[in-house]
Amino acid sequence: MAGDLEGGKSLSGLLSGLAQNAFHGHSGVTEELLHSQLYPEVPPEEFRPFLAKMRGLLKSIASADMDFNQLEAFLTAQTKKQGGITSEQAAVISKFWKSHKIKIRESLMKQSRWDNGLRGLSWRVDGKSQSRHSTQIHSPVAIIELEFGKNGQESEFLCLEFDEVKVKQILKKLSEVEESINRLMQAA
């Protein structure tokens, strides 16, 4: 059985299938498909634990966004661990990660973002031309236009108008946010 799971091409294919399912959202890559295409001679009761082990290793490597030194240390530890992986499997995993790291990282970054993202921001300062109160006409106002959207979809726009008091309030809040971020960065 162990020899059946040693094949580099099959393991590389398995890792690709796991990555497609876990990180790229291809739900058609199922356990049954991987088993029948890559390891048809291995009984399901032996394939499932092997699949779970490889899935766990791949998720650990990806979630830690391991660089190549960390990867080598991690895989070396896995080869020495009871019930771990063989050095041949470690070599295949290392080769796979080196060629797929960037795509997996980008996919994880996309998945971690909110649905809509800020695509653009533009602003200008104008003089107010209409108001309920004549004293406010010609007073300066900041006009901010925000562009929101998902990749591959049409944008939505939000236009905001602020008088001098509101601009000062926003700047104060942004300063508080900056101070909070700086405190957190210094603590880390």
UniProtKB/Swiss-Prot annotation:
MF annotations from Gene Ontology: copper ion binding; low-density lipoprotein particle receptor binding; phosphatidic acid binding; phosphatidylinositol-3,4,5-trisphosphate binding; phosphatidylinositol-3,4-bisphosphate binding; phosphatidylinositol-3,5-bisphosphate binding; phosphatidylinositol-4,5-bisphosphate binding; protein homodimerization activity
KW Cytoplasm (keyword) present: yes
Subcellular location: Nucleus; Cytoplasm; Endosome membrane; Cytoplasmic vesicle
Posttranslational mods: Ubiquitinated; undergoes both 'Lys-63'- and 'Lys-48'-linked polyubiquitination. Ubiquitinated by XIAP, leading to its proteasomal degradation.
Binding-site residues for Cu cation, renumbered to this chain: 100, 109, 133
Region (Required for binding to PtdIns(4,5)P2): 124-188
Residue ranges of the region described as Sufficient for interaction with SLC12A2: 1-122
PROSITE patterns per record: COMM
InterPro entries the record matches: COMM (IPR017920), COMMD1_N (IPR033776), Murr1 (IPR037351)
Entry keyword Protein transport: yes
GO CC terms: Cul2-RING ubiquitin ligase complex; cytoplasm; cytosol; early endosome; endosome; endosome membrane; nucleoplasm; nucleus
Main location: nucleus
One BP term from GO: intracellular copper ion homeostasis
Segments forming domain COMM: 117-185
Record-stated family: Belongs to the COMM domain-containing protein 1 family.
UniProt name for this protein: COMM domain-containing protein 1
Organism in which the protein naturally occurs: Mus musculus
